[in-house]
């Protein structure tokens, strides 16, 4: 069992508490999904569980973690950089792991994952594989260790649909404990039997954590019903509060007017006492307003608008390549293809991992780079290829770098 006690995570820069006072147990058979918005601390929590004694960048943590599982393994969001230069053979038959891996089971997993077992002795570098192929080998090697506990950071990324379905069924049926991060609702629904939700409240000024022993679909439906009930009750409270405050203002204005008109000292004393009572009611209403339910705010969906002041003509050829073969390091990945793409067409590249989708996308990028009259945007699978690692997000988004732009 893995036990966490009073875990709190605080951002070093603005001292915002990302995760407040979290305690939970992870037991064999648990499939605990860690969900929440980007940047709420999910990956940092997973990293801390992996190495509680190691400091984390950008955050301060307090709390304790005791892990009684015999073997805990971790798969991160990105393939380890130190393994990119290994050959497939060196990665799969690492002598450090040789005595720990059941290679009969490993070959079985590789086949189930749709990776050709004949390629396991290849001298091809891991860094030249597609993201999905790397993850398949990583999953096979990890599962062949037969761990008692799995820590997985978005394991459904990069996988083709068939492999994603296989992974969902495999994880759901594992006797091991699994704690995983995911934004994929279908994957969450198939795997999770517990939910740990880190959410921001009060317009992102605070955080709270909910731990429930429910599958994802049940949690989502109950949460939505709770949102509706709380919203109805909060609006009813606000309406009643507004009525009480309106009556209070009327009473306050009436007594204040009477005080100004009073010339008799006895009447003045009575009205002054009445005004004190009115002000007491006002203070009570203020305290009541502080204790009212908030109208719940759902996490905002991401809305991306791509401005295009001068759309491409629908008839304009972007790509027109007959008999094109996708190749990688001299190896043909496809049969000859006829590639045709005109302006305003939206084309999706689909297919199993390793068939050449990313390679083809890079080739299309190369064809269109510096094309006159065309503004090209490119988003690779690994953003480290295009994002400067030595800049902050603010520095990257600035155009001029001036102080005026920063403020």
Regions found by a protein language model. Give the residues of each.
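ABC ATPase nucleotide-binding domain signature region
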Residues: 30-37, 43-101, 199-203, 343-346, ...
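Catalytic Walker B motif of ABC-type/P-loop ATPase nucleotide-binding domains
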Residues: 150-154, 379
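Conserved ABC ATPase signature
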Residues: 125-129, 133
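Conserved beta-strand
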Residues: 4-7, 14-27, 63, 321-325, ...
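Coupling and communication elements adjacent to P-loop NTPase active sites across diverse families
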Residues: 1-11, 101-124, 221-331
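Hydrophobic anchor residue at the start of the ABC signature
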Residues: 139
């Amino acid at each position: 069992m893995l036990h966490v006690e009073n875990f709190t995570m605080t951002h070093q820069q603005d001292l915002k508490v990302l995760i407040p006072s979290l305690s939970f147990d992870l037991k064999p058979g648990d499939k605990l999904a860690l969900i929440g918005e980007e940047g709420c601390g999910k990956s940092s929590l997973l990293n801390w569980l992996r190495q509680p004694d190691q400091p984390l960048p950008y955050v301060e943590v307090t709390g304790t973690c005791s892990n009684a599982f015999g073997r805990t393994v971790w798969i991160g969001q990105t393939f380890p950089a130190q393994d990119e230069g290994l050959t497939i053979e060196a990665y799969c038959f690492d002598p450090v792991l040789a005595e720990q891996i059941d290679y009969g089971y490993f070959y079985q997993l590789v086949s189930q994952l749709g990776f050709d077992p004949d390629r396991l002795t290849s001298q091809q570098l891991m860094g030249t594989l597609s993201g999905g192929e790397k993850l398949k080998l990583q999953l096979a090697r990890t599962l062949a260790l037969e761990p008692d506990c799995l820590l997985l950071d978005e394991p459904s990324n990069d996988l083709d649909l068939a492999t994603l379905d296989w992974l969902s069924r495999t994880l759901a049926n594992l006797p091991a404990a699994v704690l995983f991060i995911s934004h994929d609702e279908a994957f969450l629904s198939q795997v999770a039997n517990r939910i740990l939700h880190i959410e921001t409240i009060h317009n992102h000024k605070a955080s709270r954590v909910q731990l429930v022993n429910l599958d994802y679909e049940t949690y989502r439906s109950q949460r939505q019903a709770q949102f509706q009930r709380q919203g109805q009750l909060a609006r009813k409270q606000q309406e009643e509060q507004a009525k009480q405050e309106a009556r209070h203002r009327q009473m306050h204005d009436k007594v204040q007017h009477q005080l100004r008109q009073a010339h008799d000292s006895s009447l003045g004393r009575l009205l002054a006492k009445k005004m004190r009572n009115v002000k007491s009611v006002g203070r009570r209403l203020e305290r009541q307003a502080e204790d009212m339910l908030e109208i719940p705010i759902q996490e905002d969906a991401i809305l991306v608008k791509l401005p295009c002041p001068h759309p491409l003509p629908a008839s304009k050829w972007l790509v027109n390549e007959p008999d094109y073969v996708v190749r990688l390091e001299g190896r043909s990945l496809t049969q000859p293809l006829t590639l045709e793409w005109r302006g305003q067409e939206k084309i999706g590249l689909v297919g199993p991992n390793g068939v050449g989708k990313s390679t083809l996308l890079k080739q299309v990028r190369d064809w269109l780079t510096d094309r006159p009259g065309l503004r090209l945007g490119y988003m690779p699978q690994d953003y480290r290829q295009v994002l400067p690692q030595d800049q902050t997000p603010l520095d990257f988004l600035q155009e001029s770098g001036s102080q005026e732009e920063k403020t």
